[in-house]
Amino acid sequence: MADPSLNDNPTACPHCASSQAGLLCVCPAGKSPVLVVEMSQTSSIGSTEFFASQERKKERNTSRESSLKDLSIRTSNVERKPQAQWSRSNVTVGKIPHIRMDDGAGIEEFYTFGRILGQGSFGMVFEAIDKETGAKWAIKKVNKEKAGSSAMKLLEREVSILKTVNHQHIIHLEQVFESPQKMYLVMELCEDGELKAVMDQRGHFSENETRLIIQSLASAIAYLHNKDIVHRDLKLENIMVKSSFIDDNNEMNLNIKVTDFGLSVQKHGSRSEGMMQTTCGTPIYMAPEVINAHDYSQQCDIWSIGVIMFILLCGEPPFLANSEEKLYELIKKGELRFENPVWESVSDSAKNTLKQLMKVDPAHRITAKELLDNQWLTGNTLSSARPTNVLEMMKEWKNNPESDEETNTDEETEQSAVYSPSANTAKQPTNAAKKPAAESVGMTSSNSSSSKLLSAESKAEPEKSSETVGHASVAKTTLKSTTLFRGKKRL
C-alpha cells in the first residue's frame, strides 16, 4: 500500500509538484531538495517508485523504519512507496531499482569505486564495494554522449533483458543509476575475468573440463530460449568466470556467467516462428543462416555453442581464413575437421556432439533442450550415440533402414513366441470366435508370410481357439505392417 503522506505523482516534488522527472527540485516552499527517482521491473531488490527526500527520512515513524530498515540505512535521502519487503540479501526475482540522478556523484554515496576491470571506447568497468555490506560488485560506467544513440539503444536493450532473467549462469544486474550524462550498471562481479583469458592461459581444456562448461552454458541458453530470448552474440569474450577451483582429479571447475546482451532480442511472435533477419554477431561464431541473411531462429545460438566447444577442446576455432569472405564460405560449407593432434585424445561422443551442434541446416541442428539430455553432456557415453533431433532421426533411418527392419524382425519373432498357443490350451466356447471388426480388418490386411505362418499353426494345433489365433494375427500383422509401410516410403 502506498504511503498516503507521499504525493501520488512520482515525477513531481511532494512539496510543490513543480519538478521534472530526473531533476533535483529546489523547492520554493523552502523545503529540502528532492530528487525524483523511479523503479524498474524484475530483479533482486523490490519496489516500484520512490522519492529522494532528506527531510522525509527524518520524519519516518517507527513502524516504517522497522519494515524498511535496510532501505532507510542504504538511502540516507531516498524514500519510496513500499509494495514489498526490501532486502539486499534477497537474490530472487523482484524489482531492479533504476535510479535517476541529477549527476553521477549520487552513486558514490552507496559505492566505493576501486580498480578498473575493463575499458572501452565509451565506458569503463570498475570493481566497487558496497559501503553498507562490504560486498564487491562490478559497475559499468557509460558516457552517453560518447556512446551515441545507437550504442545507447544496445545498452538499453541489455538492461531491459537483464531485468527479466534470473539464472545461476547468467550475469545478475543489481541496480541501475542514471544521470543526464552517464549510466551506471551495478552487476555481479566475476573476479576470474573472461573465459577467453582463462583459456588463453591454458591453451585448451580437457574433455571433462569442457563438458562442465558446456553443461552450464547449455542450461543458460535453454533457459533463455524458453523465454523466447535469443542471445545472438555468444562467444568466449561474453562468458565470464565468477570463480574456479581444481578438483581431486586435477580438473578445473569453472562457474561461468553469460553476459553482454546488447545484440540479444526477445521474440514476440510478430514474425512466423519468431524469425530474425539482421546479420549480427562475431564472424567466427556466426551460424551459416545468419551469414546468408536468411530468416533465422534461436538455433543460431546452438551453432555458437558448437564453435565455443570446439575452441575449448583444441584451442582454435573450427574455421579460419585470411579474409572474411573466405571465412564465410567455410562456415557455409560447415565441414568440421579434427586434424589437430589434440583431437586424438577426444572421444567420438564429443566429436559427434559437435557435429550435432554445427549442422549447416538449423532444422537438423540439436536444440538447447535436447543438448541438456545429450549422452556426452550427461556423461552417459556407454550407450550408442543416436540423434535426438526428429529430422536427424528420419534422415538416419532413410540412410540405414535395414537396422529398423532387423529390429522389427526380432520383435516379430518375440511376439510370435509370446502368442504361440500351447499344446495344452483348453478349447474355448464357439461363440468366442466372433471378433471385433478391427481385428477382422487386421487379419485380412496381413501379408502372405503372416497368413502362411498362421495356417501352419492352425494345422499343428487343430483344437486351438479362434480367439487365441485372432490375437496372434493382430499382433504380428501390426509389426509386419510397420515394415511394409517403411518399405513403401523407400520406393
UniProtKB/Swiss-Prot annotation:
SUPFAM superfamilies in UniProt: Protein kinase-like (PK-like) (SSF56112)
EC code(s) of this entry: 2.7.11.1
Biased composition (Acidic residues): 402-414
Low complexity bias: start-end ranges: 445-457
Binding locations of ATP: L117, G118, Q119, G120, S121, F122, G123, M124, V125, K140
Catalytic activity: L-seryl-[protein] + ATP = O-phospho-L-seryl-[protein] + ADP + H(+); L-threonyl-[protein] + ATP = O-phospho-L-threonyl-[protein] + ADP + H(+)
One Pfam family here: Pkinase
Phenotypic consequence of gene deletion: Male mice are sterile due to severely malformed and immotile spermatozoa, characterized by disordered structural tail elements. Conditional deletion in germ cells lead to male sterility, due to teratozoospermia and sperm immotility.
Entry comment on modification after translation: Autophosphorylated.
Top enzyme category: transferase
Modified residues (Phosphoserine): S403
Keywords from the named record: ATP-binding, Cytoplasm, Cytoskeleton, Differentiation, Kinase, Nucleotide-binding, Phosphoprotein, Serine/threonine-protein kinase, Spermatogenesis, Transferase
Tissue expr: Highly expressed in testis, particularly in cells from the spermatogenic epithelia. Present in meiotic and post meiotic sperm cells. Significant expression is detected in lung epithelia, alveolar macrophages, horizontal cells in the retina and in embryonic organs such as heart, brain and spinal cord. Also expressed in pituitary gland, kidney, pancreas, trachea and thyroid gland.
Region (Disordered): 51-89, 398-491
GO biological process: manchette assembly; protein autophosphorylation; spermatogenesis
Localization terms from the record: Cytoplasm; Cytoplasm, Cytoskeleton; Cytoplasm, Perinuclear region
Matching PROSITE patterns: PROTEIN_KINASE_ATP, PROTEIN_KINASE_DOM, PROTEIN_KINASE_ST
PANTHER family linked to this entry: SERINE/THREONINE-PROTEIN KINASE
Subunit structure: Homodimer.
Note: STK33 might be used as a target for male contraception: administration of CDD-2807 selective inhibitor causes production of abnormal sperm with reduced motility, inducing a reversible contraceptive effect.
Protein name: Serine/threonine-protein kinase 33
Taxonomic placement: Eukaryota, Metazoa, Chordata, Craniata, Vertebrata
